[in-house]
């Protein structure tokens, strides 16, 4: 069986493992957390859940970094809490988490480098584009074996909102949100389609109101913060996103996903992790064809990319990383 590990056993990490179990992914699961009691509690709970699933030979154990040398997948979900303050205030930009989370990620990266981990690294810890870029620099791991969850959630939310307006299944909505996972995301309406019909045509035919479409971007960006305000954290959606990446990798599905990968020299900020369509299979990821964005969309994409390039450099400086 495959060996799948999660580092950080909070809401996201534990839900990720449960989602894989519910999807029927048989594996030796390892849960790693500084709070070993928390990890042990989840292990016991997951074993109970597995016992009710026939023909599933999965195992669950508390792990250490040394156990991860031969892991196939490691998901890094460790992060500072994103719960609202005592006054009910919620952070409004994922980049606000960088200063604290980069120190946590650096410690984890150095440990995985020490043990010689060679598998796929999945990084949802925010700001995930920056964290993935820092992680690659610190570890020196193959960039194609590092994926940030990127704008996968924004894509899911955009498809959801379009499908609700049109009364169709979200699978019928084609297109990817690209750029930064956060306020710098770009919804390229020029490439979005529903049942192979361009959004522009659907608006012209009166199938969907232009005002509704224009409002989708702000709603997508705010959605996570609304969820955090009401239930203190987001974890169902992001766990499903991580599960999808994991399954594409271990089953060699070669699925095109809108996830954070390292940009090549076709882009203005090459070397950073940023969301573009990528094919995910057993070798990690490879870039899909570059999207043909409108002039306005490309300008927004480039501006956001240059900002992430700067923040990634700032994060590396913060941990004292030198090339």
Curated annotation (Swiss-Prot):
InterPro entries cross-referenced by the UniProt entry: L-lactate/malate_DH, L-lactate_DH, Lactate/malate_DH_C, Lactate/malate_DH_N, Lactate_DH/Glyco_Ohase_4_C, NAD(P)-bd_dom_sf
Coiled coil: none
Cellular compartments annotated: Cytoplasm
Entry keyword Oxidoreductase: yes
Glycosyltransferase as UniProt keyword: no
Catalytic residues of the enzyme: 181
BP terms from Gene Ontology: glycolytic process; lactate metabolic process
Entry GO MF terms: L-lactate dehydrogenase activity
GO cellular component, one term: cytoplasm
Residues binding NAD(+), per UniProt: 12, 33, 65, 149
Family (UniProt): Belongs to the LDH/MDH superfamily. LDH family.
Subunit structure of this chain's protein: Homotetramer.
Protein's name in the database: L-lactate dehydrogenase
Native organism taxonomy: Bacteria, Bacillati, Mycoplasmatota, Mycoplasmoidales, Mycoplasmoidaceae
